[in-house]
Amino acid sequence: MTTVQKKPALPERSHLSLPPPQKPTRHSWQVLAVLMMAGCLSSAAGAVVAPVFPEIVEHFGLSSRWAGVLVSTHTLTTALSSLVFGLLASRLGSVRILLSCLVGYAVFGGVGAVANGFWGILFSRALVGVASGGIGAGSIGILSNLYNGEARTRMMGYATSALATATVIFPILGGWLGLYHWRSAFLLYGLGLPVALVGLLLLPKGRRRGADIPQADGIGAILKQSRVVLLLLALATASAIFYVVVVYAPLYLKQAIDASSLLNGFVLAARSVGAAVIAAVGAAKVSKRLGAGGAIATGFLLMAISLATIPSVLEPSLMLLAGLIFGLGFGLVMPNFYSALADISPDSQRSGVLAIGTGCASLGQFISPFIFGPIWASAGTQVFYTAAAIAATVGVLNWLRR
């Protein structure tokens, strides 16, 4: 893994709807608030379902080996659509993409509440992923062009904190609704409609532009840089490890102590509390003191410690503490990754590069069950030790290369 030295941005104006102001304005804060609300829904695409996942597995009689694919299906379509929407942002306008995908998120997500079979829910999850990819590509592209340098890292931290806060609330809400019936959790996707309405009122309307072939060519050149490739691989790795907690921790707690959907929701929420706290108040400071590589290394090592303790922790209070530690690590890793990608991307290619980063993170979540599912099926709790070993290895490599 690698750290990336900052390069001065090229003097090209971004192709997104918003020019980057030198100082935050009232309007930019309003835009930031809308982007955070939209991003919260996108980040909660999996968190809504995770607490009721054991009930879904039981209802459909799914094999434990591949059951995680149901939770992670949306991440594959998110990965694919993030790249497409990122490249289309200059042609269709980021705001237009964002608003339409928010509506799609609400509609497609709600289908899960009425789907009659496993394949219907799976198809619904795939479409939710498409919408989530558009939300993420539009949101992070606009955000990256609102601020520069250290301010961007700080704002990325605020955004990560908001997204993590959403994944505090949504698992608890999903788990609470799941006490009545697991289908009720899918109703939370309907929140995409009011957020789309707020966005329609507050976000500037982008202009339709012609196709931007040079942007695609420029992105291809950037992707040939070894540092960028390593960052994207690390993003995918972090997300794959993240989904070990999302998918297999609830299944383990269900088996070990017959945990309810509400308890699973609180445990998942504790992870998000840690991410919210460190992303809001610590990610930029740790990065400034240790460098991006040092901050990323510290985050991975915290994730490893948390994962290694899961099999031996059965007290609710200790479960929450383990989740909190994992969240602290994840909250250090992600904003520094995205900020590093933004720093080495010219203005005209930044939205596309960050969309690819989002896609790689989603791809990591999708492949997680294929990598760790067989370990869970054959060795049970060894899946947590395996993920911890991978996280520790990535952390050490980043520390050595910082």
Which positions does each model-derived feature cover?
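Helix-to-loop junctions at the C-terminal end of transmembrane segments
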Residues: 82-93, 278-291, 376
